[in-house]
């Protein structure tokens, strides 16, 4: 680094500290290494990490940084594995968004919530539940730490996705800081007269430009999400299948029927990994929450007892498992949906089993992200594809054939694999292969 460049960098740091405070401009090697890696890999080190407390600080910091030709990169909870916030150039500044974590407004009349991008799904879920409200899609499995802004940037799925789709499908409007530091709003929030962020389709869909972009096109600072009443009743089904073709067919049919808030499945290997990983302490906590989640104290205790009795042994002889969660506003509507699922799945050779897993997952939707390592500390990374239902079985066939051809290579490098399946609204089918392997320190 030349003297002139050093002086310019020192001035940049000084200017950023004036805006953000000394403690919110990080430059130690330890900090830079931590922030310059995601779940999958490390990248070249960022030049700096900055941690704004609010939108105005962020706006000023971005304007200062880009004026000096530095790339600025948003980072949420740091739980992605897609290179989205990893530096690609030497002059990069990572922006930690986690201090922008407030819930700004819960509008029960117009049924939307305004939340800052650094808020976690776990926090949002708990606050809304206390008001008997929920967002339609309500978070990824990593929602204990993953942020709303990260989900909108990555377009994540899981809880609620079977009916309501992905994270981006729930968004009504955004506040965004652009590369020059200017601040814009989208949707009906952008109108100059009595703005209210209740409606996304206000002119051209500028909201969509900033969704599913991994943060590349702007810094989402505030996000407006639809609200629905918290479901009064929930019920569960699980099924065992002998082959992947039947489970894929069943999941697609359930998805097309539009009756499952969540519809997901595991292959034998990934199912086994999940069961190995969970500890007794986690099980006890899960059982307590299963008991609390029943429609009455007695019903909750009965549910917890069934889960305790069947436990993990229910999966001992299950090749492929499919799990369904059904929400509704009455017992009769729930029962109708449950019977529709059975009518779809049983002719596909699905054998009904105790739905312990979906009960536990709904009772504790945001568990610690211990799935980011194998049960013995192995490295972990998933990849995925989303296809229309008409291509789901073919994609699984291609996946199986590919790995069958790579058996020797997988054994040589001690790589094991499995996959998660999930449906997205009526149209999408997700196949997510997951890899486990011993890294260089084993």
Can you annotate each of these PLM segments?
Residues 54, 79, 111-112, 119-124, ...:
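Short, structural beta-strand-to-alpha-helix junction motif
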């Amino acid at each position: 680094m030349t003297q002139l460049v050093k002086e310019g960098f020192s001035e940049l740091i000084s200017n950023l500290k004036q805006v953000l405070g000394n403690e919110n401009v990080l430059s130690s090697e330890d900090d830079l290494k931590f922030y310059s890696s995601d779940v999958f890999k490390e990248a070249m080190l960022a030049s700096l990490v900055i941690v704004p407390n609010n939108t105005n600080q962020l706006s000023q910091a971005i304007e200062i940084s880009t004026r000096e030709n530095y790339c600025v990169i948003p980072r949420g909870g740091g739980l992605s594995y897609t290179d989205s916030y990893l530096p690609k150039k030497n002059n990069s500044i990572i922006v930690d968004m986690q201090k922008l974590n407030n819930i700004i407004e819960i509008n029960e009349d117009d049924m939307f919530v305004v939340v800052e991008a650094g808020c976690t799904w776990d926090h949002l879920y708990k606050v809304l539940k206390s008001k008997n409200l929920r967002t339609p899609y309500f978070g990824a499995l990593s929602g204990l730490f993953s942020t709303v802004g990260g989900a909108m940037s990555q377009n994540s799925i899981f809880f609620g996705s079977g009916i309501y789709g992905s994270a981006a499908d729930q968004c009504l409007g955004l506040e965004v800081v652009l590369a020059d530091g200017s601040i814009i709003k989208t949707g009906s929030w952008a109108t100059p007269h009595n703005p209210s962020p209740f409606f996304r389709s206000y002119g051209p869909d500028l909201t969509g430009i900033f969704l599913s972009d991994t943060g590349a096109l702007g810094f989402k600072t505030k996000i407006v999400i639809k609200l629905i009443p918290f479901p009064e009743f929930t019920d569960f089904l699980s099924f065992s299948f002998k082959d992947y073709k039947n489970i894929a067919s069943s999941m697609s049919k359930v998805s097309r029927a539009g009756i499952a808030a969540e519809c997901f499945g595991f292959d034998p290997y990934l199912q086994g990994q999940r069961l190995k990983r969970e500890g007794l302490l986690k099980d006890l906590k899960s059982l307590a929450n299963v008991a609390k989640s029943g429609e009455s104290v007695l019903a909750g205790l009965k549910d917890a007892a069934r889960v305790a009795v069947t436990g993990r042994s229910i999966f001992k002889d299950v090749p492929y498992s499919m799990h369904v969660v059904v929400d509704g506003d009455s017992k009769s509507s729930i029962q109708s949906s449950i019977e529709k699922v059975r009518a779809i799945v049983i002719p596909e050779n699905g054998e009904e089993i105790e739905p312990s897993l979906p009960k536990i997952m709904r009772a504790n939707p945001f568990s610690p992200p211990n799935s980011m390592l194998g049960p013995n500390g192995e490295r972990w990374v998933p990849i995925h594809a989303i296809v229309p239902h008409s291509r789901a079985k073919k994609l699984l066939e291609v996946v199986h054939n590919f790995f069958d051809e790579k058996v020797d290579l997988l054994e040589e490098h001690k790589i094991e694999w499995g996959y998660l399946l999930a449906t997205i609204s009526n149209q999408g089918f997700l196949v997510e292969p997951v890899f486990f392997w011993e890294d260089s320190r084993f």
